[in-house]
Amino acid sequence: MRPSTLRSFALRLVLALAATTAVFALLERPFVEALRPLYRLQVYWLAPEFRVNALTVADRKGETVVQLDVEYARDATVHGIQIPKGAGLTVSTLAGYALIHPIVLLSVLLAWPGLDTRRRAWGVVAALLLVLLLEAWDLPLMLLGAVRDAILAKVAPGQWSAAVAWMRFLDGGGRMALPLAAAAVLIAVLVTRAPSRPGLEARPRVRPARPEQ
């Protein structure tokens, strides 16, 4: 990428980030509310041992949070410790985390140079599908990680948990890295699979025959 193109991309990226951040900041609550069924389904799929009593979006001390209330659906054993059916807890995480994926992914896509309108439009559609995938592996895992962390802190401190490890990965920079990686893959596909225009296929050049002397 040439320096002039790089500067143009950086400027467009700043403008795209400002615009998408403003839009999603206004739509934070309805956006996260719309994702609640996805979050609930993911929690049920990843942790069938829990019964989800409630998964809500709430305001707490001026911040919007996603709150999960679960209890054990049956008697369970965790690292040799018996946990009775009905034992539960409530955890929460910031709803604003859900905004990072669409803001980063869409901003990079909208700012990237060299994409025509058609490819950029298809890219936005694909980006929205990727956002759903990223969302399914963010807040639900944050909430489950908090649940597992709280349980392990009581019954088996220091024990490893996949949900806790993923939660820490997201908090340690993974939440920003995932949409950037998704944007890179999507842009690579859009660039390498550019649709050919009809009527512009390359044709072999035919040189006129020289007259015999």
PLM-predicted stretches and their roles:
Residues 3-18, 118-129:
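Alpha-helical transmembrane segments and their helix-start/interface "positive-inside/aromatic belt" motifs
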Residues 7-55:
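N-terminal signal-anchor transmembrane alpha helix
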Residues 26-27, 109-117, 187-196:
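Structural signal for the C-terminal ends of transmembrane alpha-helices
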Residues 63-108:
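Individual transmembrane alpha-helix segments
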Residues 100-133:
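Mid-length scaffold segments of soluble, non-membrane domains
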Residues 136-157:
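Juxtamembrane non-transmembrane "cap" segments at the membrane-aqueous interface
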Residues 158-208, 212-213:
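Primarily interfacial, aromatic-capped hydrophobic alpha-helices that serve as membrane anchors
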